[in-house]
Design a protein with these regions (language model features):
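Alpha/beta enzyme core
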Residues: 1-82, 90-106, 112-113, 119, ...
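Histidine-centered beta-alpha loop that forms part of the nucleotide-sugar donor binding/catalytic region
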Residues: 85
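Substrate-binding cleft of secreted/luminal carbohydrate-active enzymes
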Residues: 111-114, 151
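Flexible C-terminal active-site loop/helix
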Residues: 125-168
């Protein structure tokens, strides 16, 4: 299967547009390499940095070692943004991540943690037909509501659904 990659100059133009439109100086612009070879990824990254990208995100199977990430980091001159999956998650040390990355995200840790917890608790619930003795703890309703800011929803419900609109 062939992979369609956006032309580098079109990508650079989009980065320049994002830089120009940036209102918050703390907004970080991350550019993806989307390249088939390491050399192409480095060349694309250089162009993206010149266009104003703050971080480079190597979305490419051509990087298979820390040495390749080091070459990208050195070649483009800015820190990398890493999505820590697969070998990145398993093989890189914290020190290596800090060496090359300005931003590192573990995008599936939460999902996989919740999935395993659900699997364990639902298996026990199916077996025992009771929530007592579940292998993983559950949050209580009050803490859950507090965590998601449900009091704001309840205030809006009170205001609009019950007709308690503020006087103008």
């Amino acid at each position: 299967a062939s992979i369609e990659i956006l032309p580098v100059m079109e990508s650079a133009a989009k980065i320049r547009a994002a830089v120009r439109a940036r209102l918050d100086p703390n907004l970080i612009i991350v550019a993806r390499t989307d390249a088939l070879t390491e050399a192409d990824a480095i060349e694309r990254a250089k162009i993206y940095v010149e266009a104003g990208a703050d971080l480079i995100q190597p979305i490419s199977r051509c990087f298979t070692s820390i040495d390749g990430l080091r070459r990208l980091r050195q070649g483009c001159g800015v820190p990398l943004s890493l999505q820590l999956l697969g070998w990145l998650e398993n093989d890189l040390t914290t020190e290596q991540i800090q060496e090359v990355a300005g931003l590192a995200v573990y995008p599936l840790v939460g999902l996989f943690t919740v999935t395993e917890t659900l699997k364990q608790n639902y298996a026990q619930l199916w077996k025992s037909k009771s929530v007592h003795g579940l292998p993983q703890p559950m949050i209580n309703m009050a803490d859950s509501k507090k965590m998601i800011g449900f009091s704001e929803v309840e205030a809006l419900q009170s205001m609009f659904l019950l007709g308690n609109l503020p006087k103008k």
